[in-house]
UniProtKB/Swiss-Prot annotation:
This is ATP synthase subunit alpha. The gene is atpA. ATP binds at residues 169-176. PANTHER family: ATP SYNTHASE SUBUNIT ALPHA, MITOCHONDRIAL. The keyword Transferase does not apply. GO terms for cellular component: plasma membrane; proton-transporting ATP synthase complex. InterPro entries: ATP_synth_asu-like_sf (IPR023366), ATP_synth_asu_C (IPR000793), ATP_synth_asu_C_sf (IPR038376), ATP_synth_F1_a_nt-bd_dom (IPR033732), ATP_synth_F1_asu (IPR005294), ATPase_a/bsu_AS (IPR020003), ATPase_F1/V1/A1_a/bsu_N (IPR004100), ATPase_F1/V1/A1_a/bsu_N_sf (IPR036121).
Length: 515
């Protein structure tokens, strides 16, 4: 066989000319050490702060410490298979989670992956977990109510849409119960709720999901769970992931409510990560930026104006404001609200609801201390009728507490003081409410109206709650138009008051309420 050298050289030249080599540029590094979920990597000179890194076995990590000759990263999940000498790749992306309506009704982990066994979530949209909060110009003042359905909160410590209201108290004082009531009460209002469980037992989270399902609240709720058994990194990220999911609705001119249960455990997880990364510890061994950890999260809860919504939706949604309301929960130790994390979060939020162990054990539930609980912006958002009728409640309770303290030393009390004490006792009793028995505006207004006009003056304290319940049922059946009118207008007309006065007279004559 004759070989033609010219032919061969032509073939080789043609191959060389047509050769296309697409060079993929990727920064790679080598694992130096792995300890407690923290990986030190050599050679990732181009890594960004907060960038996602890819480890062998499709495991993701987060670049947190950018040092001169190494990068300190935290692994998001299992790290037992990562070993010294493994190759790590930069992804060039900041950590993102899936967002969208498809998440509603589902239970997901801190990275937005479904963990409820109901199959994959079909959403194509993702958003970064870390975002800059809306600026002053993009915001609108809080002037719409976020009804919790709890008499004590809606009358004395009102929450508005776009507000951050802290729920603070010791363990086992009913903090989660208050937050769950607020979520259940949003049924039928169009408000989407996000419940972020941080560092809780998996059994507790399963119980919360079951209760929400029982009360039909999962239809408007997303549950983001980072259990106590998961990596500290996931417990640290979970609140930001939940916030991103809530911002999706806020930026489209809708209203959302997010509960962080609880931020004390997030701070502990962040402290663990920071100490393992050898960052210098400060007060209570927390790192220096623990205030920023919570402030950058809670500042993202806001009410944004129409222009901002229009800009974010590219003109699709016009004339609508969006809001994200936050109810962060903080657990105190033996009622110490002057500890580092509680004082930080109190200073960031727009008010706080203090829950006390003594009140809880005395059977006053929700165990709210009305004296030191405040809402700094909610007053402007309160419904007219509740604002008008609820004004005397806080005063009555304050006077009652003061007189109750003095009456312990006084043997004989004058008639006026005795009446005031009795009134205070009745008000305290009527502020009690069972879990998942939320009231709408009209039902709450009815109770407050009855307190204000002295209808309970001849009702024994022990029978006050039963009297309230029976009277509500009576009005629901005999005068439903009054409740409908109050719910529709948010105010109580003179005509409605006259109808209620007649109804109260008729009810008292037929109901055996006296001891």
């Amino acid at each position: 066989m004759q070989l033609n050298p010219a032919e061969i050289s032509d073939l080789i030249k043609a191959k060389i000319e047509n050769l296309s080599v697409n060079a993929e540029v990727s920064t790679r590094g080598t694992v130096i050490s792995v300890t407690d979920g923290i990986v030190r990597i050599h050679g990732l000179s181009d890594a960004m702060q907060g960038e996602m890194l890819e480890f062998p076995g499709n495991t993701l990590g987060l670049a947190m410490n950018l040092e001169r000759d190494s990068v300190g990263a935290v692994v998001l999940g299992e790290y037992e298979h990562i070993k010294e000498g493994d190759t790590v790749t930069c992804t060039g992306r900041i950590l993102e989670v899936p967002v969208g309506r498809e998440l509603v009704g589902r239970v997901v982990d801190a990275l937005g992956r479904p963990i409820d066994g109901k199959g994959p979530i079909n959403t194509t949209l993702t958003a970064p977990v870390e975002k800059i909060a809306p600026g002053v110009i993009a915001r609108k003042s809080v002037d719409q109510p976020m009804q919790t359905g709890l008499k004590a909160i809606d009358s004395m410590i009102p929450v508005g849409r776009g507000q951050r209201e802290l729920i603070i108290g010791d363990r086992q004082t009913g903090k989660t119960a208050v937050a769950l009531d607020a979520i259940v009460n949003q049924k039928g209002t169009g408000v989407i709720c996000i419940y972020v469980a941080i560092g809780q037992k998996a059994s507790s989270i399963a119980n919360v999901v079951r209760k929400l399902e029982e009360h039909g609240a999962m239809e408007h709720t997303i549950v983001v769970a980072a259990t106590a058994s998961e990596a500290a990194a996931l417990q640290y990220i979970a609140p930001y992931s939940g916030c991103t999911m809530g911002e999706f609705f806020r930026d489209r001119g809708e209203d959302a409510l997010i509960v962080y249960d609880d931020l004390s455990k997030q701070a502990v997880a962040y402290r663990q990560i920071s100490l393992l990364l050898r960052r210098p510890p400060g007060r209570e061994a927390y790192p220096g930026d623990v205030f920023y950890l919570h402030s950058r999260l809670l500042e993202r809860a806001a009410r944004v104006n129409e222009h901002e919504v229009e800009k974010l939706t590219n003109g699709e949604v016009k004339g609508k404001t969006g809001s994200l309301t936050a109810l962060p929960i903080i657990e105190t130790q033996a009622g110490d609200v002057s500890a580092f994390v509680p004082t930080n979060v109190i200073s960031i939020t727009d008010g706080q609801i203090f829950l006390e162990t003594d009140l809880f054990n005395a059977g006053i539930r929700p165990a709210i201390n009305a004296g030191i609980s405040v809402s700094r912006v909610g007053g402007a958002a309160q419904t007219k009728v509740i604002k008008k009728l609820g004004g005397g409640i806080r005063l009555a309770l304050a006077q009652y507490r003061e007189l109750a303290a003095f009456s312990q030393f006084a043997s004989d009390l004058d008639e006026a003081t005795r009446k005031q004490l009795e009134h205070g006792e009745v008000v305290t009793e009527l502020m009690k409410q069972k879990q998942f028995s939320t009231l709408n505006t009209a039902e709450m207004a009815l109770t407050l109206w009855a307190i204000n006009n002295g209808s309970y003056s001849d009702v024994p304290v022990a029978k006050a709650l039963a009297f309230e319940s029976e009277f509500l049922s009576f009005v629901r059946t005999q005068h439903p138009e009054v409740l409908e009118a109050v719910n529709a207008s948010g105010a109580m007309s003179d005509e409605s008051e006259k109808t209620l006065e007649a109804a109260m007279k008729s009810f008292k004559s037929s109901y055996a309420y006296q001891a």
